[in-house]
Regions:
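Catalytic alpha/beta core domains of metabolic enzymes, predominantly
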Residues: 133, 137-231
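Conserved N-terminal beta1-alpha1 strand-loop-helix module at the mouth
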Residues: 8-81
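Alpha-helix-loop-beta-strand connector modules within alpha/beta enzyme cores
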Residues: 42, 70-93, 129, 133, ...
Length: 264
């Protein structure tokens, strides 16, 4: 096992989030080698910068627009790769689930679960995730107000006292566009244990916008960011246009840490 220090998920709750927190990784597990390369790079960066990292990758994409879109390499194969990331690097890993039946199985391989934005109101899914007793990240739906997310958090807290993070994912602004309302950061902070901002799915398919979104989010009081990254986004099998190239992540996180230190 890698000698890096394992950090317990949830030790960095909103009431004591002094370190920048990042959920980062590829959109989906494409293969073992790419996943390990991304995890190794991110962990080296975050250890060096003293940033809390949750490594994220979907083991299956269930919400693709096109029938011929890539959905995964097989559930068990992908979950075993995510488990290997944890074992090899002593890293906390998070993956998303789309149906209640997935929760217990996924929880055997990862240290936290994520609820997709489109499903953030699904009671059965939220309760199933809560019953695993793992920390949970809920991505706020593009159709949801910050205040409405209190109900989603309440469903989870009716079952478990484990940390609940909300990731701001923007709000619909006409057809095929979203905008991030920075007021939501302070509004959400009162109802959960930490607020992150998704800076890749809100960039309109132009990853350069992610840098300004990330800086503004931390300056506005977010505890951290959610981002997806890939060594070669042009060859990524899912969401390549939104992804930040892996070689640019360190510069971004260095800047965000500096902002975080100023705003506290």
């Amino acid at each position: 096992m890698d000698s890096r220090v394992h950090r317990d998920v949830g030790s960095n709750t909103h009431t004591g989030m002094k370190r920048l927190t990042v959920i980062a990784g590829p959109c989906v597990v494409e293969n073992r080698d790419t996943t390990m390369r991304i995890a190794d790079t991110l962990l080296l960066i975050c250890d060096r910068l003293e940033i809390n990292l949750l490594f994220k990758a979907s083991y299956r994409k269930a919400n693709r627009s096109r029938m011929d879109a890539f959905t995964g390499i097989g559930d068990m194969t992908a979950l075993e790769i995510l488990s290997e990331v944890h074992d090899r690097f002593a890293a906390d890993v998070i993956t998303d689930i789309h149906e209640a039946e997935e929760a217990a199985r996924a929880a055997m391989f990862v240290q936290a679960l994520q609820i997709p934005a489109f499903l953030c109101r699904q009671t059965d899914l939220l309760i199933a995730a809560a019953k695993t007793d793992l920390p949970i990240n809920i991505k706020k739906g593009q159709f949801m107000s910050a205040a409405a997310m209190e109900n989603a958090v309440g469903k989870i807290r009716s079952v478990t006292g484990r940390p609940v993070i909300i990731t701001e994912r923007g709000n619909s602004f006409g057809y095929n566009d979203v905008v991030v309302d920075m007021r939501n950061i302070s509004l959400l902070s009162g109802i959960c244990d930490g607020v992150l901002v998704d800076v890749t799915h809100t960039n309109g398919g132009a990853y350069r916008h992610s840098f300004a979104l990330a800086a503004a989010s931390i300056a506005a009081g977010a505890d951290g960011i959610f981002l997806e990254t890939h060594p070669d986004p042009g060859k990524a099998l899912s969401d390549g246009k939104n992804m930040i190239p892996l070689y640019e992540v360190e510069g971004l996180l260095t800047q965000l840490k500096q902002i975080k230190e100023v705003v506290g």
